[in-house]
């Protein structure tokens, strides 16, 4: 049955919540989250974090909630034979598929790499100590909805001092056209553990997709003392899907996180991406890229929280906007009074590729401690005519010259992806996005 979001949240849906299996503590968690979701108003123009975008189209569109899980799997969202060999573990989940593979040595070492719903049914106590601890349902209406209603996602737990040499791949099919989907993703590394994880969000993303859909998700990351995680997160949803996520990482003492985030798909994508350094010596690098075209809207809200002494954060996000698209980046570095000798850096660079595109960049600092080194900056500009002229004098047509400059602009970010084949895939997507922008 098709229902708008306001109509859906206007009902109790106790029967729906009862369908989720798991221990009593998890049922209580979902029930409490649902009450938060019902009680909270939908965000709007009066909310600072939401005032630059509109959810009117989303709220007025009828969607199907929890459609037939045997619905077709989007092309390209399964795991290829080549990927199965290259990665130490692969997980494809959503839309009727649940395929998990992990090298036997990792299983024997105690690594858990499974679908969130499977863990809830089979080993619910694994979730009890982290569910909602990193991203509380109170973070927002959509965070609460995902906490209450998620029926897919990844659960990764790596035991102390275990280092996974080969990367892990998660391919998450989030939503069929015309439907709403909710995901809950958890990555937990115990003290001294390390891993490289690729989190690939997909939908029925063919360019011909005509039906609208919604994905609301949360990502909870907890890194124990001295843990080391490289996370490559790619959002490649279809062109008619709304994507809203709340994502946060907590770092204990001397933990390290390198988080590469890429936004390329969706009609509208609103993402809260936050790191909290709660242990001395914790360090985070945040690299991001986004390329909007057509009428796409990207709104990225990043937060670097320094909550302990001698912590380091370094953020570099780059974006481009073509057609009549709109991009918003808003960043904040927060330094707690106890976070002495903090080193925080925040940089945002943007290219405006057409007269109809709209770009906003809003860096921010809130420093409550002395003896810190923090800086922030943002730029919005067009392609450099001198660079274009130089390339054209070398016999390169203007369109090709523009493409080369854009590839170089994003290259600083894509080079941070530690997997060569994935770098090439991202570069090809950026090329295709530019070619589409030129055609329009």
For the regions a protein language model found, what residue spans apply to each?
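Conserved beta-strand/loop scaffold segments within soluble protein domains that form the structured core
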Residues: 98, 104-396, 410, 414-440
């Amino acid at each position: 049955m098709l229902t708008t979001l306001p109509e859906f949240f206007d009902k109790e849906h106790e029967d729906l919540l009862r369908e989720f299996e798991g221990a009593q503590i998890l049922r209580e968690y979902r029930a409490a989250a649902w009450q938060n979701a019902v009680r909270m108003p939908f965000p709007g123009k009066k909310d600072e974090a939401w005032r630059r975008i509109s959810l009117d189209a989303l709220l007025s569109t009828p969607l199907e909630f929890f459609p037939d899980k045997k619905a077709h799997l989007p092309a390209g969202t399964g795991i290829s034979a080549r990927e199965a060999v290259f990665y130490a573990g692969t997980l494809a989940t959503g839309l009727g598929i649940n395929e998990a593979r992990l090298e036997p040595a990792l299983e024997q070492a105690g690594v858990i790499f499974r679908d969130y719903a499977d863990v809830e049914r089979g080993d619910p106590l694994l979730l009890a100590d982290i569910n909602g601890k990193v991203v509380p349902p109170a973070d927002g209406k959509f965070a609460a909805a995902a906490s209450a209603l998620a029926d897919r996602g990844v659960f990764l737990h790596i035991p102390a001092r275990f280092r996974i040499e080969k990367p892990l791949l998660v391919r998450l099919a989030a939503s069929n056209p015309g439907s709403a989907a909710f995901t809950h993703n958890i990555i937990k590394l115990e003290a001294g553990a390390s891993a490289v994880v690729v989190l690939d969000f997909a939908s029925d993303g063919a360019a011909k997709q005509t039906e609208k859909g919604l994905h609301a998700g949360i990502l909870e990351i907890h890194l124990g003392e001295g843990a080391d995680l490289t996370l490559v997160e790619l959002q490649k949803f279809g062109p008619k899907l709304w994507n809203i996520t709340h994502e946060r990482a907590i770092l204990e003492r001397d933990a390290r996180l390198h988080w590469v985030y890429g936004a390329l798909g969706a009609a509208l994508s609103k993402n809260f991406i936050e790191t909290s350094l709660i242990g001395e010596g914790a360090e985070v690098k945040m690299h991001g890229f986004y390329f909007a075209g057509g009428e796409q809207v990207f709104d990225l809200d990043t937060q670097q929280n320094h909550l302990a002494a001698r912590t380091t954060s370094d953020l570099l996000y780059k974006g481009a906007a073509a057609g009549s698209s709109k991009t918003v980046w808003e960043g904040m570095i927060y330094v707690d009074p106890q976070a002495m000798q903090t080193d925080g850096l925040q940089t945002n660079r943007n290219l405006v590729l057409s007269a109809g595109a709209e770009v906003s960049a809003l860096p921010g600092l809130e420093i409550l401690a002395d003896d810190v080194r923090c800086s922030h900056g943002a730029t919005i500009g067009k392609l450099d005519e001198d660079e274009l002229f130089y390339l054209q004098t070398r016999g390169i047509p203007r369109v090709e010259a523009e493409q080369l400059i854009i590839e170089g602009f994003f290259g600083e970010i894509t080079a941070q992806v530690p997997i060569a084949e994935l770098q090439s895939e991202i570069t090809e997507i950026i090329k295709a996005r530019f070619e589409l922008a030129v055609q329009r």
